[in-house]
Curated annotation (Swiss-Prot):
Intervals, Extracellular compartment: 77-441
Subunit structure: Interacts (via RsgI N-terminal anti-sigma domain) with SigI.
Region described as Disordered: 213-441
Cytoplasmic topological domain: 1-53
UniProt subcellular location: Cell membrane
GO CC entries: plasma membrane
Species this chain originates from: Bacillus anthracis
Domain RsgI N-terminal anti-sigma: 3-51
Reported induction: Part of the sigI-rsgI operon, which is induced by heat shock.
Gene deletion effect: Loss of rsgI results in a strong increase in sigI promoter activity in both the exponential and stationary phases.
Compositionally skewed regions (Basic and acidic residues) per UniProt: 252-281, 429-441
Protein name: Anti-sigma-I factor RsgI
């Protein structure tokens, strides 16, 4: 069947003809007589397929290309893998590893310039297991002389999913044990997303950021001052020790409560010493007297007397007397010697004959020709002889007598009589009589 059409294109062996139906048909060329735009007649059997045909040898290659495109489209349309945790590796180069739920590395970022140098040298890290990538980072840091013997590897894990923390911790501990055998220190710690964000803003790794913050906190918080046992001991020693000397004398209070009225009136009497009377009050006193009588009462006092009579009263006192009469009485002791008597001590009383000495706390001396009253809070009565009183004592004497009482005092008297009363005193007297009585004798 013959068809007609207008020649639209002329090729070497064929021509393209436009049919009245608007179709383009390629048919064999007949000689060189046809021209473009000329209407020609052609047979349908001579018509060539106008569809595009692929050569036979290209068909396998085209099939491979088609498969590649399909695979590319498939992976392209897949959703991006989710990051479940970050692990910061800080040596001097700092890098951050992003891992999936099964701890595959899907991203690796450098946190500083040294980290970028290491990252450029790392190859084939993507989709590798976390342990393998960390080993690669440590090895490359050793090769580049970043990791030396005086440095350590700090691993900081930040898990988005709390369920992943035990798995991360297990991997980190295995790495720590592995590198301990290689004499490389590996430290592991966990952190939070907020700390990671602060580290990113500071441009450093998370582990380095935590270390710097800890150092700042230590510098701000002042160390607690440890208690110095030496200073505490000095403070305890500086406090007044409770001793029998400091404890208020309750016995004196009791004595005052039950004292007779005449004794109370006698204690109120305060007499000023005459020209020949001298009183010295203080601890550790030393007195020397050359006269008729001497009394030595005071703590740790020493007295020498060359007269007729001497009385030495006090604690642990020693007396020597070579005179007419001497009485020495300690605490609670009583001495009675004929016409003359001296009684010195706490709460002691001595009364005999014409002469009497009464020395002690709250003690009183009796009126007579001679009287001595020595002790705390004691009073001496008017007489021919003198009574010597210790701490806080009052003494009245209108005779040729002298009282020397007190700590650390030194007095000298040249007269008829001298009284010195105290603790631990030593006296020597060369006269007519000597009496020495110690405590509780």
């Amino acid at each position: 069947m013959m068809n007609k059409g207008i020649v639209m294109d002329i090729k070497k062996h064929s021509v393209v003809v436009l049919t009245p139906n608007g179709e383009f048909i390629t048919c064999k060329r007949k000689g060189d007589s046809c021209m473009i735009g000329e209407e020609i007649s052609f047979d349908e059997q001579e018509q060539k397929a106008s569809r595009f045909s692929i050569p036979y040898f290209l068909k396998p290659a085209s099939l491979l290309v088609a498969c590649f495109l399909c695979a590319l489209l498939f992976f392209y349309n897949q959703p991006e893998e989710k990051v479940f945790a970050y692990v910061s590796v800080d040596i001097n180069p700092s890098l951050e590893v992003s891992v999936t739920k099964d701890l595959r590395v899907i991203d690796l970022q450098a946190c500083n310039d040294d980290g970028r140098r290491i990252l450029k040298e790392l190859k084939q890290w993507e989709n590798k297991q976390l342990q393998e990538v960390i080993r690669t980072i440590i090895k490359q840091s050793q090769e580049d002389k970043y990791l030396t013997n005086d440095k350590q590897v700090m691993l900081t894990a930040i898990a988005k999913d709390k369920l992943l923390e035990p798995k991360l911790e297990k991997v980190m501990k295995e790495l720590k044990k592995e590198y301990e055998l290689k004499h490389i220190t590996v430290e592991y710690q966990s952190s939070t997303m907020q700390v990671r964000e602060n580290a990113i803003k500071a441009g450093i790794g998370t582990g380095v950021y935590i270390k710097q913050e800890n150092e700042k906190n230590k510098s701000v918080t002042p160390p607690a001052t440890p208690s110095n046992p030496v200073e505490n001991e000095e403070e305890r020693q500086s406090q007044p020790d409770s001793s029998p000397d400091v404890v208020p004398d309750l016995s004196s209070v009791k004595d005052k409560k039950y004292e007779k009225p005449e004794y109370k009136e006698q204690k109120k009497i305060e007499e000023q010493p005459t020209k020949q009377i001298k009183e010295n009050n203080g601890r550790g006193s030393q007195q020397e007297n050359r006269g008729n009588q001497q009394e030595n009462n005071g703590r740790e006092s020493q007295q020498g007397n060359n007269g007729n009579q001497q009385g030495n009263n006090g604690r642990e006192s020693q007396q020597g007397n070579n005179g007419n009469q001497q009485g020495n009485n300690g605490r609670g002791s009583q001495g009675n010697n004929g016409h003359q008597q001296e009684n010195n001590g706490r709460g002691s009383q001595g009364n005999n004959g014409n002469q009497q000495g009464n020395n002690g706390r709250g003690s009183q001396g009796n009126n007579g020709h001679q009287q001595e009253n020595n002790g705390r809070g004691s009073q001496g009565n008017n007489g021919n002889q003198q009574g010597d009183n210790g701490r806080g004592s009052q003494q009245g004497n209108n005779g040729n007598q002298q009282g020397d009482n007190g700590r650390g005092s030194q007095k000298e008297n040249v007269g008829n009589e001298q009284g010195n009363n105290g603790r631990g005193s030593q006296q020597e007297n060369r006269g007519h009589q000597q009496g020495n009585e110690k405590k509780n004798q």
